[in-house]
């Protein structure tokens, strides 16, 4: 799962947290003017994409809070600071912030999922962290019966790590690990999450098992085709429709492949990738 997509999920969770307003209004009412000013400035900078400046503002707000314990408004500031650090690509700093948050609420699955994502990104770049740390955090979140979009994204991030390692080292054991983790995700979601099915379909195509890939594609499309889609769901459907055409092409069923790509073009328009596929297929069908 890519940085922007995960960050949007985190940002949405934070906004919903404040929309509830149960504790936020009380705590904001008791904070200092300097603390409030820096907190609001940090949120504005975060929304503008000025992540480093946002972190500085949140640090000033925490300093103004003046408490030696992690509680109250300071937790909310830390949540925003952690997001800003993550979106800035400062994963080590984000890890520190989420570990602080976990020390205040060790059972909050959101923090575990973000640590799973961060540990995945730090694997192979930090000698003290490896993919097993990410899986441990993911499993802890799963034990909280976590079925959130963020949890799904954490699992996909781990699976994609294994696929990236395969691409770098061409060691099939990485593909085995990716498949094992994706099957775990399919089981957790009861094969009812289109995003997981889309990633699984691409993986099975890489393994040249096009029948299993098509099965996942058909399941994923069936989950989405009759509902009003969010932006994320529409991107997933787009991926599934392209995968359908690719699978039929690899199976040498060129007529079905062309039909699938034409359906893709009808819905999403023509781009360079699909134009190349269509040209190839038309040449073959002749």
Q: Where are each of the predicted segments found?
A:
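Flexible helix-coil transition and linker loops at the boundaries of alpha-helical arrays
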Residues: 63-75, 103-111, 141-151, 184-191, ...
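N-terminal leader/linker segments that initiate helical-solenoid repeat arrays
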Residues: 30-80, 87
């Amino acid at each position: 799962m890519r940085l922007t997509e995960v960050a949007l999920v985190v940002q949405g969770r934070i906004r919903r947290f404040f929309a509830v307003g149960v504790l936020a209004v009380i705590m904001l009412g008791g904070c200092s003017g300097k603390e409030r000013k820096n907190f609001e400035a940090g949120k504005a900078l975060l929304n503008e994409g000025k992540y480093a400046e946002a972190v500085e503002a949140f640090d000033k707000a925490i300093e103004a809070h003046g408490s030696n314990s992690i509680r109250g408004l300071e937790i909310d500031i830390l949540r925003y600071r952690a997001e800003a650090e993550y979106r800035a690509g400062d994963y080590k700093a984000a890890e520190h912030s989420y570990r602080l948050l976990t020390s205040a609420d060790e059972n909050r699955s959101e923090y575990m999922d973000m640590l799973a994502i961060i540990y995945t990104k730090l694997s192979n770049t930090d000698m003290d962290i490896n993919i097993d740390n990410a899986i441990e955090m993911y499993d802890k979140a799963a034990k909280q019966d976590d079925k959130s979009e963020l949890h799904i994204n954490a699992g996909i991030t781990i699976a994609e790590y294994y696929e990236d390692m395969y691409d770098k080292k061409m060691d099939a054991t990485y593909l085995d690990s990716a498949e094992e983790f994706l099957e775990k995700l399919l089981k957790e979601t009861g094969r009812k999450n289109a995003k997981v099915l889309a990633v699984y379909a691409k993986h099975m195509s890489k393994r040249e098992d096009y029948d299993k890939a098509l099965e996942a594609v058909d399941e994923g499309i069936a989950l989405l085709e009759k509902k009003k889609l969010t932006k994320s769901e529409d991107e997933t459907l787009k991926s599934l429709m392209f995968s359908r055409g690719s699978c039929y092409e690899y199976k040498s069923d060129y007529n079905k492949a062309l039909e699938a790509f034409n359906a893709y073009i009808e819905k999403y328009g023509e781009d360079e990738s699909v134009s190349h596929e269509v040209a190839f297929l038309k040449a073959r069908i002749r």
